[in-house]
Design a protein with these regions (language model features):
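C-terminal beta-signal and adjacent terminal beta-strands/loops
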Residues: 237-240, 490-492, 531, 576-583, ...
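Gram-negative outer-membrane beta-barrel transporters
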Residues: 488-490, 508-581
Length: 654
């Protein structure tokens, strides 16, 4: 029996360190296909086995056939000044494009990215927020299926509204091309949906959680579609570790209902995509560990739509897209007589393009508008309109250097304009070593809560401003790659809520600085074994007080050991977050202790003609006390088993 490649296997297509978007990857045996995204990353088509032939094609390039393997594929395009470029496969890894990790849980997907932290208010019932490089959760832009998840009320992106089944792989970019505006100071996290084979999944754990989902998917010559529906239930009774004691918390129950639909059509040189995602959450709000609440609850909903039409040209593409997001929340707490409702809607339309003028010049642009509406018992009814335009030019072989320059202009209806820029200069010293330097700016617009909260909203707020500089060096060898970087981020006009005596009000007062020294690396010890890891040292300061920034640890690190072979798949991962100040107080400061989060999973050899897959996992393997938000400890060690039954697995060999 041929060995099937796990559906988590990814690849990337690049051309002289530039990603190649919208290439088709076709399995010649099964006729199933995938399309690379705008960053050149693709998933291996479903049902692919070791030794299958994959055809890589895109207008403007000669079609190439390669043999599939379990090792993440890096496909590089070599340019020709006369003919269209020919696709060639390189055996080395790419230091410029670190292949994303995939995992069985939200924690695994997010924590596998360099410098990231996933902050949660306890278990599944708590809000989950991502942060990076010791920054705030509002400084990392999060996109799911190209849809901005930012809540315009508070500027945050609640990842607990996305069921694990929605999450395929994650990637982070530095927003060098300025495709994104407000809230992207620390970068942009792209969460890509996972294309699951048709079948059903059932997961259960010792904590009493139950997870059930059903999927259908298929692809034909010109189009593919997939749909899913499911439910996730957690009674919230699994004990947490706090002060070295196991404590069973009350009112942490969580019920989630979700559905999703995705269709992709390719016809000649046209691509079109449409997706719908929906989730409903009903959860208890347990409160702080030392001040529990057994009555509060929240019901929240999330509805997402994304549609795009893409025209591919030999030297680029033109893309038009429309996205819509609707998020609603009802919070009820009879103890404090609170019954609040919050509804936010946002619709965005944009046009983007990529054009390679010649072998040295590449031009990109991104233009669009968005409308945000909120209706809240605490904020009232408000609408914000914004439009934007960004443009960038990349120049290769510029006196031995590669140069990138980008600028962006955002215009808001409620406070004016914001201008940002981005520049990067890089050079190859040797075939295996390169250096680069970058600098740029970013901003964060005041949220509706900042502007209109009753009482205390301040409509005279200005946007926050940040400026960064970064120097890095990358080394690439036959089976490994490493990066060393130093980054400095300075921010001003930071919005801080201060007491007026009668109520709290936001003002632009604070300034801060962060210096981040980071090392990333990955090593392929064999075709089946890979080690990945990163570590960040962060030195931060609130310039108004001279103190270390709150919620900014000195150290963030992660490592992962992954092995795939003979139908088995296993990985062990560890994430470390250093201690951090929560509040400066007298006589002692309030702080969070260091966290060491560990996870182990084992995928057992599929049985019954590859139709039944079993995965065993252990979260918090070392059974450490975990707390990423002060007062909300997370679950102790837990065991889970996931069983999936996949349909239509038998494919005739040609």
């Amino acid at each position: 029996m041929a060995e099937e490649i796990p559906i988590s296997t990814t690849g990337i297509i690049v051309c002289q360190n530039e990603s190649v978007a919208f290439a088709t990857i076709l399995n010649n045996r099964t006729k199933l296909w995938e399309i690379s995204n705008e960053n050149g990353i693709f998933l291996i088509p479903q049902n692919t086995q070791n030794g299958d032939t994959l055809w890589i094609s895109r207008i403007g390039f000669e079609t190439l056939s390669i043999e599939s393997s379990q090792t993440p594929s890096i496909i590089e395009l070599n340019r020709s000044p006369i003919h269209f470029p020919e696709i060639q496969v390189q055996s080395k890894t790419s230091n410029q494009h670190i292949l994303p990790n995939s995992g069985s849980s939200r924690q695994e997907v997010i924590s596998g990215l360099s410098g990231t932290i996933l902050r949660t208010y306890g278990g599944n019932s708590g809000i989950a927020l991502a942060a990076m490089d010791g920054g705030r959760t509002v400084d990392l832009k999060v996109l799911f299926d190209e849809i901005d998840l930012t809540n315009p009320l508070n500027g945050m992106s609640d990842l607990s509204q996305l069921p694990n089944l929605f999450l395929g792989f994650a990637e982070i970019n530095e927003n060098l091309f300025l495709n994104n505006g407000t809230g992207s100071t620390d970068g942009v996290m792209h969460l890509n949906p996972w294309s699951h084979p048709p079948g059903v999944q059932l997961q259960t754990g010792l904590d009493g959680t139950q997870y059930f989902s059903g999927q259908i998917s298929n692809s034909w010559e010109d189009y593919s579609l997939s749909a899913t529906i499911g439910k996730n239930t957690d009674p919230g009774t699994h004990p947490v570790l706090y002060n070295s004691e196991l404590i069973e918390r009350k009112n942490q129950q969580f019920d989630q209902y979700f559905s999703g639909f995705h269709i992709e059509i390719k016809k000649n040189q046209w691509l079109s995509k449409l997706s719908l995602w929906n989730s409903i959450q009903e959860r208890g709000i347990s409160g702080l560990i030392w001040s529990p609440n057994i009555e509060a609850n929240r019901k929240d909903t999330l509805a997402l739509f994304s549609g795009s039409l893409i025209r591919i040209f030999p030297k680029g593409f033109l893309k038009s897209s429309l996205t819509y997001k609707k998020s609603g929340e009802n919070y009820f707490d009879p103890t404090f007589a609170i019954n609040s409702n919050h509804l936010s809607k946002s619709i965005s339309n944009k046009v983007s393009g990529f054009y390679q003028l010649n072998s040295k010049l590449i031009y990109r642009f991104n233009a669009g508008f968005a409308i945000e509406d909120v209706s809240s018992t605490d904020v009232g009814n408000h609408q914000r309109n914004r439009n934007y335009f960004s443009s960038s030019m990349s120049i290769s072989h510029f006196v031995g250097f590669k140069f990138l320059s980008a600028m962006r202009l955002d215009n808001y209806s409620d406070f004016g304009t914001a201008f940002t820029f981005s520049d990067k200069l890089s050079r190859n010293i040797f075939s295996w070593l390169s250096i680069s330097g970058a600098m740029g700016s970013s901003f964060r617009a005041p949220t509706f809560n900042d502007l209109y909260w009753n009482p205390g909203g301040n409509p005279k707020l200005n946007p926050e401003e940040s400026y960064y500089s970064k120097v890095s060096t990358q080394a690439t060898f036959s089976n490994s790659s490493f990066e060393l970087s130093i980054k400095n981020t300075d921010s001003k006009n930071l919005i801080v809520w201060k007491s007026t005596g009668d109520f709290w009000q936001p003002v632009n007062v604070n300034e801060s600085t962060r210096r981040i020294v980071g090392i990333n690396g990955q090593v392929f010890l064999s075709k089946k074994l890979i080690i990945q890891g990163s570590i960040r040292y962060i030195q931060s300061e609130d310039l108004s007080t001279g103190n270390q920034l709150r919620h900014s640890p000195n150290w963030i690190g992660n490592t992962k050991f992954g092995w795939k072979g003979s139908g088995w798949e296993t990985d062990f991962s560890m994430h470390y977050t250093g201690s951090q100040i929560v509040m400066y107080d007298y006589p002692n400061n309030v702080s969070l202790n260091k966290n060491i989060s560990t996870h182990f999973s084992l995928g057992i050899l599929p049985i019954l003609q590859n139709q039944i897959h079993i995965n065993l996992s252990i979260s918090n393997l070392l059974n450490k006390e975990l707390m990423t938000i002060y007062g909300y400890p997370e679950a102790s060690r837990n065991f889970k088993i996931n069983i999936s039954y996949q349909l239509n697995k038998k494919v005739k060999n040609e």
